[in-house]
Design a protein with these regions (language model features):
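Interhelical loop and helix-boundary elements at the membrane-water interface
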Residues: 8-43, 64-109
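Transmembrane helix interruption/hinge and helix-loop junction motifs
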Residues: 1-4, 48-56, 111
């Protein structure tokens, strides 16, 4: 399980930090934009290497939805977490990464 999680984390970091273009980064928050689908497709393809197809596709779709920022905005509203200024950007980036990593941990546990 730990080995599977570490492989998933490496795939995630490569797809999110090295393979994500400026085009994807700027447009992935809209489900109507192809960049969102291309970005999550890259993640899904990577996850297909280590997870069974159902789990890989589920993790890929979760990545797509998390990157719209709507679940993160909902979380901040429910728990009244609304940092301001430059801290808000950093908080959003790391909140996004934390949620993706939790999803990978769950996927690794059930695989």
């Amino acid at each position: 399980m730990v080995e599977l999680f570490l492989k998933g984390l490496i795939i995630h970091l490569i797809a999110d930090w090295f393979l994500q273009s400026d085009w994807m980064s700027a447009n992935k928050t809209s489900l109507l934009h192809p960049a969102a689908w291309v970005h999550s497709g890259i993640h899904t393809l990577g996850y297909l290497v280590i997870f069974n197809p159902a789990i890989a596709i589920t993790v890929g779709i979760s990545h797509l939805l998390i990157d719209t920022r709507k679940p993160l905005i909902w979380w901040r509203q429910i728990f009244q977490q609304s940092p301001k200024g430059n801290v808000a950007v950093v908080f959003e980036i790391w909140q996004d990464q934390a949620v993706h990593i939790v999803i990978l941990a769950i996927a690794s546990l059930i695989s």
